[in-house]
C-alpha cells in the first residue's frame, strides 16, 4: 500500500517558498521523534518532480555506520568504474570532464552522487590540493550557470554524533554549507533531526549565528490529529471512526503521526481499539519503568532528581525549559523521554504515550 500524504500545507508552503528564492540560509528541520520530518521532505521532493530545474541530493544517515571521515564520503558518493568516462578523459582534464559528467548524470532525486572511479581517485587524493567539498562547489557552480538549482538534504543529522572526529567533519561540512548558501548562494541546504541538543551543538560549534534558520515539524495539534484519523481510517479501513473513538485515540497517543498510523493499522488487523491503546501504553510504561530502575540502581540521588523533574509533567504537557535543571533536562532529552524546543525554550514529553506513562508511573509520588 502506498502511504498517502496528509496536510502540512503550512510547512510545505514555507519550504517551497525557500526553494523558490536564492539560497541564503542553512535550514534545520527539527521536531519530536516520528513527527513526520522525513515524510514531509519526501512530499516536497515529490512535488518538485516535474520541475526540471531542481537537482536534489538526499542523504539519509539512518542505519549507516559512520565511524570515520571517509565513511561519510562513501555515503555522499557512489564510486563506479565507468568506461565512457575513461574515454572522455583520455587527454582532457579529469576534473573538468567530471563536472560535465555529474551534470549529465544528476537526476531530480539522487541518493548519492555517482562518481567514476578515475575521477574519485583525483578528488580523494588531497595531495593534489583538491578536496571533495571544493570539487562539489565547482559542480554546483556549473549547475547554477546552467539554471539548475541543487538542493542538499541531510536526514538524521545526529548520526554524525558517533564519529570520533565529528568536530572536524561538522566544521568542514557546515563551512561548506555556509559557503554554498550565505556566500555563493548556489545550493539549498536542509538538515533534519529530532535531536535538538545535537542541533544546538552544531549551531554553536560551527558558528552559525545569522547563517541558519529553523523549521519546526511538530506532532499534529488536536484538531489536525482528529482530521488525520478521518483521513487514515477512510483510506485504510474504508470507514469513518466515531467521535468517541477519535477522542479515545487522541487521549492515548495525541497527535503523533506515527502512533496514530499504528493504531489504525492495528484496527485493520481486527483488534479492539481499547486493547490496542492499552497495549501501546503498557509498552511505554514498561520502558519508562526499566529506565527509572536502571537510574535508581546506578545513582539514587539522580533518580530522585529525575522523578522530581518528571512530576512537573503530571499537571502540564509543556513547560518552560529552565524549570528543570540543565543536567537533568539534557539527560532526559538524550534518553528520548523529553523533547526540547531550543527556539521556544520549551520541554515536553517525546509523545503523548510517554506523557501518559509518566502520569501512570508517578501517580503515587
Ligand atoms: N503528513 C503525513 N501524512 C501521512 N502520514 C504521515 C505524515 N507524517 C508522518 N506520517 C506517518 O508517520 C510516520 C513517521 O514519520 P517520519 O518517519 O517522517 O518521522 P520523522 O520525524 O522523520 O522521524 P525521526 O524522528 O525518526 O526522524 C510515517 O512513516 C507515516 O506513517
UniProtKB/Swiss-Prot annotation:
* Binding-site residues for ATP, renumbered to this chain: 31-38
InterPro entries per the record? AAA+_ATPase (IPR003593), ATPase_dom (IPR011579), MJ1010-like_2nd (IPR049081), P-loop_NTPase (IPR027417), WH-like_DNA-bd_sf (IPR036388)
Gene3D superfamilies, alphabetized: P-loop containing nucleotide triphosphate hydrolases, Winged helix-like DNA-binding domain superfamily/Winged helix DNA-binding domain
A single Gene Ontology MF term assigned here is: ATP hydrolysis activity
Q: Does the keyword Zinc apply?
A: no
* UniProt entry keywords in alphabetical sequence: ATP-binding, Nucleotide-binding
| The keyword ATP-binding appears for this protein | yes
**Official protein name in the record:** Uncharacterized ATP-binding protein MJ0075
